[in-house]
Amino acid sequence: MTTITHTTHTTDRMPPSTWSPPARWARWSAYAVATWAVAFAGVNVWLLFGGVAADSPLREVWGAMTVMNLLVIALKGVGAATALASVQPWGERLPRWLLTGSMWGAAGLLLLYAGLNLGVMIADGQLTAMTALAGGEFIVPAWAYATFFAVPGILFAAAGRDHQRRSGTSRRWAILGLLGAPLLLGAVLFGMPALLRLAGLLPA
């Protein structure tokens, strides 16, 4: 009687983890931008739950303000989680192309928003002027407002580039992420307000 032996080749087994640790600068870039996103989301939570004065003009459009706050809280939460996933082993559970594209998309969105604001400020000669935010709840120098978004954009790009290199993700996903940035920014700045007007939550 012939005994049939089955040999399991290494290619039939689950491959060992291919996760490689990020560069130190990439890890700290991801941690810094995740902290920024969570802290910034905290500002929206504060505005949503009592941070706006009773006589603030925002109270006149409070329904729209609530929707926009919830939207940006969600976006910032996703941004923080994405940044952490790019430098942690548990991030390997997510598709690498999705992480790379999301990191570059976040970088593109923030840098584009900062660049547009900076361009308008320079054109209007208002770079050093003070600007009111959130219905006057915050007053900061105009240049600081642009910098507030530019710096995390650079951090997202740094961590995203390192993740792309380590994971061997194709460059096309980074490009697609960057191309998607203007679409998401347009949806937040123009698409959502348009929908809120249709819903009667913002004046026409």
Identify the role of each PLM range.
Residues 35-39, 101-116, 184-189:
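Hydrophobic alpha-helical membrane-insertion segments
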Residues 174-196:
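Final/C-terminal transmembrane alpha-helix of multipass membrane proteins
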Residues 19-26, 84-99, 154-175:
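Cytoplasmic membrane-interface segments at the C-terminal ends of transmembrane helices
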Residues 2, 6, 12-59, 120-121:
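Transmembrane alpha-helical insertion/packing segments
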Residues 134-151, 173-180:
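Individual transmembrane alpha-helices with interfacial aromatic-anchor signatures
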Residues 2-3, 71-83, 142-159:
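Hydrophobic cores of alpha-helical transmembrane segments in multi-pass inner/ER membrane proteins
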Residues 48-64, 122-139, 195-204:
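Membrane-interface interhelical loops and short amphipathic "cap" helices
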Residues 14-31, 56-63, 90-97, 101, ...:
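Juxtamembrane loop-transmembrane helix junctions in multi-pass integral membrane proteins
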